[in-house]
Amino acid sequence: MYKKYLLLLACGLILTGCGGGGESESTFDSNTSTSGNGNGNGNGNGNGNGNGNGNGNGNGNGNGKYLVVPKDYDKPDGDKVRIYYTIHPATSSKQRIGILLLNFGGPGATAADRLLSKVSSMPTSITESFDIVAMDPRGAGKSAFARELMTCAVGGSCDSTYKEISPYMGSNAVIQDMDSLREHLNEDQINYLGYSYGTRLGALYAERYPTKIRALVLDSSMSPLHQNYEELRIDQAQGHQKIAEYRLDSKPKSMAKLDDIVTQTKDSDYTANDGGTIKKDDVNLILGAIKHPMREYLNNLRGISWSESKLGLSLSALFDKDEAKPFICWRTQCETESNSLSFSHIPKESFTSDEKRSSAMFRSVMCTDERATLDDSDIEGNEDKYLASSSIYGYYLKENLSGLCKGWTAQRSPIASQSEIKNNITEQVLIVGGLYDPQTSYNWSVEMKDTINNAALITIADTVGHGFSYNGIGSCLDDIVTNYLLEPEVKVTDRKCERVKRISYRYSNEAPTVPVNSAHSGDIHL
């Protein structure tokens, strides 16, 4: 089902995915679906019961708990499933405002096991004021359907499993779980901070439950315009091209050379003037590395610009002097260039069980959510649309990521349309978008801002990155997000923020490592 690069790139193109929970199946609930009165046993340090109305819970490992909810919300008295969540209580009962629900993106990743790390990056005013909550969505972590997805993904075929569970694990089901959790916690409203795919969940929740949302932050937003997966990827190509233009300092000759190399290597190798040979896999590596956000952060640590990095210099030689050997030299050393950090986009030979589960979940949710479905023939024949979006990245995305929903036969649960979001969300919403975001293109944040009648857009202008709030961009952004969460009724205006000059990451033996609370860690989906 997956093309050569599909599993790898699907795991790297949306904020979290292909991991996030443990790889051991023992971390999953052994009984994710119950029937009758909804009774189900919790695991870990405690047991819990559900009573059919979705308001039961049991303590799991650590601070985790289970919420019992309907498998199918259209049949509230039918089978029940359990949703795992964790809470970091507000540290000041006097300052407490309510709950702040976090979603780090996906679809495919956990959330509960990342909560404490994220809390550590938040200011005291937020941790004092909110019970901070993270919920593993259906299909991930310790929540329902995670075991089923892992089993079928490891076995190599999920078609029959998709037919059984996908109708009950799309975004519509998740936002209903979110509201069940709100009710269970006896809260009138929620505050929400969602990254990447989490912005889809936040917007859909606010559309369906407009009176139940107090504050809504959509960081690295998905677009409300995309009606299916192919539209998303086609649109993403032009966002990637903008990043290439930014990386190459908007040099027309460099962009033209890159375009020529991409075109030639579709059918044959490219031989440069110095005798070096560039193959199609090399081009995939180049295109992936140009848009990879961690390049930016590693360079920041070293105090150098993109053009001063080894990769930047080797590509300058290739594009400006038609010399391929510097890039070939870089390619052979790229695994050690950054010590513990690898940026190779060469397909992995193997994936962990949880990476496979995550990729299967990604397909399940993205295809279930589609509003306008495409015939297989339409998907196969859409290369011209990819190339119209970007002559450089169009073929790259078409070859490696198109066709995710080809052959999909499971029942869908279409998400709300742009007009429904526009008509039903009335409270002020804060949107954060990166001008050079490789996962959720900047125009998607603009489209979300234009859709919501009362919204402000904070633009991160000078970095290739994804997921920005409380992730090291600096006080310009974090203060805006914090003040909005504390007082969402205060009007926020559009503005630009720039990252701090140098981002400090944790170090181990003086080698930079990715902070586990970072939205830029290697487990990025949308």
Where are these regions (language model features)?
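Alpha/beta-hydrolase fold active-site neighborhood
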Residues: 258-423, 517, 524-525
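Short beta-strand/loop motif that positions the catalytic acidic residue
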Residues: 425, 431-433
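C-terminal motif of bacterial Sec signal peptides marking the signal peptidase cleavage site
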Residues: 15-17
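Catalytic histidine-centered segment of alpha/beta-hydrolase-like enzymes
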Residues: 464-475
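Catalytic-loop region of hydrolases
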Residues: 20-152, 254-264, 409-413, 456, ...
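A catalytic-pocket lid/entrance helix-loop region that shapes and gates access to the active site
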Residues: 206-260
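Conserved alpha/beta-hydrolase "acid-adjacent" motif
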Residues: 438-443
